[in-house]
């Protein structure tokens, strides 16, 4: 588990990810509602590290929320997943 101070330190390197209600949260704009390529890439990354985000899809927008529910806190797994998702997001 990471302290809030540690999480905020990591956030400085994570672009526009935010700490909201005990989760790391970020929304990504897509080119269209049917642009599922980004979500599929996120799913593959999540599966590869066995850590899965909450994914909310709205019209041309994908919101990702990360939290380690087994310990009810943000952990290094969330930071790793956010970092890898951020790399995908820069290619949108």
Give, region by region, the residue ranges found by the protein language model.
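Charge-rich alpha-helical segments
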Residues: 1-92
